[in-house]
């Protein structure tokens, strides 16, 4: 039977291997960045691929099983790795409309980039449109942002951050292509469905995946 010292040495060795693997992963991400930089035009667009992120997280959760660390730990760990990779690929500036959405986007991106709060929804959206900031976090009860999204073809919702502590969730939006979204993604739409999200702004959710002129964005459901 091994003693504490031997076991701790093993743990330290595993930690070093994990660090080396993460450093290697970051170098690969830099290679991905180079390719994306060469293929994107001059008009800013987020490199983030929600479909790829959903696929990675789902595969991780399905792989780990029920032994050892809980699935929530693996989800948070890989969510942090993915977000760190997002920031390696692009120098992203984060914006939030309130303290709640600030905390959510700060946690979502692994506390690696400090967001800025702009409570004026029109000003916040304008700074997103003009690329002063690149991702905007807002609460699902913010009807002003929904109204601005209705008249915009570039800025789209691409993620939702859910918390157990409150009813209103946080949406993330930015200049992103919706082409990569597919089922089981959920559509945020102005077309009336049986799942209303914001009555004041006439915004709905649709699980019948279809991107059309009424689509304000899409997001994937949680994998755990």
Residue ranges and their predicted role:
Residues 1-224:
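Domain-level signature for soluble enzymes in the chorismate/prephenate branch of the shikimate pathway
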